[in-house]
Swiss-Prot record:
The gene is mdh. Its EC number is 1.1.1.37. SUPFAM superfamilies: LDH C-terminal domain-like, NAD(P)-binding Rossmann-fold domains. Keywords: NAD, Oxidoreductase, Tricarboxylic acid cycle. Substrate binds at R86, R92, N124, R155. GO terms for molecular function: L-lactate dehydrogenase activity; L-malate dehydrogenase (NAD+) activity. Disulfide bonds: none annotated. It catalyses: (S)-malate + NAD(+) = oxaloacetate + NADH + H(+). The active site is at H179 (proton acceptor). Catalyzes the reversible oxidation of malate to oxaloacetate. This is Malate dehydrogenase. GO terms for biological process: lactate metabolic process; tricarboxylic acid cycle. The lineage of its organism: Bacteria, Pseudomonadati, Myxococcota, Polyangia, Polyangiales. It comes from Sorangium cellulosum (strain So ce56). NAD(+) binds at G11, A12, G13, N14, I15, G16, D35, N99, I122, S123, N124. NCBIfam families: MalateDH_bact, PRK06223.1.
Amino acid sequence: MANRRKIALIGAGNIGGELAALIARKELGDVVLFDIPQKTDFAKGKALDLEQNGAVLGYDASIKGTSSWADCAGADVLIVTAGIPRKPGQSRDDLVATNLPIIRSVADGAKEHCPNALVIVISNPIDAMVYEFKRRTGFPRERVLGMAGVLDSARFQLFLAREANVSVKDVRAMVLGGHGDDMVPIPSACTINGVRATELISKEKLDALIARTRKGGGEIVQLMGTSAYYAPASSAVAMAESYLLDQKRLLPVAAYLDGEYGYKDIFMGVPVILGGKGIEKIVELPLTAEEKEMLAKSAKSVQGITDVVKASS
């Protein structure tokens, strides 16, 4: 009898709980909901609630709350949400000093117990945290990625659909660059059922949608007092599903660049083919001069925060 897949979720907070619920409903595998020892009972309680939910919704996934890395051993996918979420007035980069020790601890546990897992980092600032995770573990770049572009593109996709008054299902959007205020929505790559979005939406309105996309996470923080969790969880699950089922979806993720787009030794949002081997190909899009300029600005921001991480190691 084949072994069931195991997905380990590091952090049992808002995103961790929603991740567990989505993974269980999709029957992608059994779930380990991991948190620090002080929150062991919280993780166990959330796991029990989710398992009981399975009796209502009809899924059979095992969901275990724990603070022991031994329970994560051999995980097929590791999704890292551990860290302090943003509060109103904070940027993602403000979290680096707080979350860096946390990501290092997680990296050490993963290296020992989950050496063959695909790793998806959600903890902010994503581009810096995923860089440190890869640096500390030495995992191959094909199996270490940050969740950013899927979420940012989804936000852009929604705003485009609302502006054009069309179904969000017909909109395809792409956001590259760092997961911050300098992210790069790519108008030339946006289509509405094959029609360029630029033909249906004026440049003035498109620029306003781009600005809102860049501040999309901050808008939610201001409204809720904490970071988003439904859409981020769905974005990470889409990535995990493409890997586990070898779907080979083209998704924008924070990937380690080694010359692609002209950048080296940084993680930044780019389109990739994500399949059973992890990142199987980085897709280099033809960009307009304006888009290249915006990407360079974003890369400079990412490099700055990455240099802070390098200096502290």
